[in-house]
Amino acid sequence: MKVTILLENTVCRSDMKCEHGLSIHIAADKHNLLFDMGPNAMFLENAEQLGVDIKAVDIAFLSHAHDDHCGGLELFLKRNDRAPVYLQKEVWGEYYVVTPDKCEYAGMDKALHRFDDRFRLTEGVTVIDDELTLFSGGMGRDYWSHANDTLCEKVGDDFPKDAFRHEQDLLVTSGGRTALFAGCAHNGIVNILRRAEEILGRSPDVVFAGFHLFNPSLNAPEPRALIDAVAGELKARTNTKYYTGHCTGLQAYRELKEMLGDQIDYMSGGSVFEI
């Protein structure tokens, strides 16, 4: 399995562009996959620099409805006219960032409904084939990140906290190894790992995910106690390797690295990993 980070908040190559968002290309035994499309066309530009043919993608996935992951979806659908895109069925909700200073829509562009024939809506565990499994829901709320606190869903005239029902995660089994892909892990990376373990009967070999440990409303990482607790859970899975970035934040990554050492590394835009 070859994993290429098309877009992330940072870059490891001078010929790449970066922006707050995430897009990952996965070349597996049976499939040529795209996981998230970032906020705009930048993932396409970077793909060209990296020699990744977006037209050759045969299946795509959206981790959740936030615009830093789905903003490039329309551009993908226009560039690639054949790949189905798997979406959790709650992606069409009204998702907002709500702070004392703003109430800003951060969800899917409803104009994308014109591509409904390309979309495959999922719920719970969806086994696509022996290589690909999607899952959502059925998770606890341990190690909850308060970086989620400004994320809301509009329901009538109210803005309750987002329950992240629209978030889904992907398991890819290829070459005898299983990788877990999670966009922002709003539901908590530990909770997502536990659900993946229930499905697999073991821990995944590799994890690629943002851990949502940077709080943008405070411009600061989550408290060290939370980061240490998450690190302890990750470290206990001694045979699992982690690649993180995006909403984890650089300071939180450094703190995780202190505890996990070689068990964790950063996934900058332009990084290529052979699994």
Language-model-detected regions and their locations in the chain:
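Conserved beta-strand hairpin/beta-sheet module of binuclear metal-dependent hydrolase folds
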Residues: 1-50, 163, 167-181
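Active-site metal-binding loops of divalent metal-dependent hydrolases
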Residues: 8-10, 37-40, 65, 90-91, ...
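Active-site neighborhood of phospho(di)ester-bond hydrolases with catalytic His/Asp-centered motifs
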Residues: 34-37, 57-64, 86-88, 180-182, ...
